[in-house]
Amino acid sequence: MKRTFQPKNRQRKREHGFRARMASAGGRKVLANRRKKGRKSISA
């Protein structure tokens, strides 16, 4: 059985990146919550 995590930078950015988060209301909420919590990094 192959491992489930096969890292790809393009896929990572497209699915979890800042612009992907900003594209939907839910994603913007995620960023707001991470900013409020004081996360060092707010998106991939």
UniProtKB/Swiss-Prot annotation:
Residues 1-44 are annotated as: Disordered. GO terms for biological process: translation. It holds the Pfam family Ribosomal_L34. One of its GO terms (molecular function) is structural constituent of ribosome. The keyword Transcription does not apply. Keywords: Ribonucleoprotein, Ribosomal protein. The keyword Zinc does not apply. It comes from the Bacteria. Residues 1-16, 31-44 have a biased composition (Basic residues). One of its GO terms (cellular component) is ribonucleoprotein complex. NCBIfam families: rpmH_bact. Belongs to the bacterial ribosomal protein bL34 family. This is Large ribosomal subunit protein bL34. It comes from Syntrophomonas wolfei subsp. wolfei (strain DSM 2245B / Goettingen). The gene is rpmH.
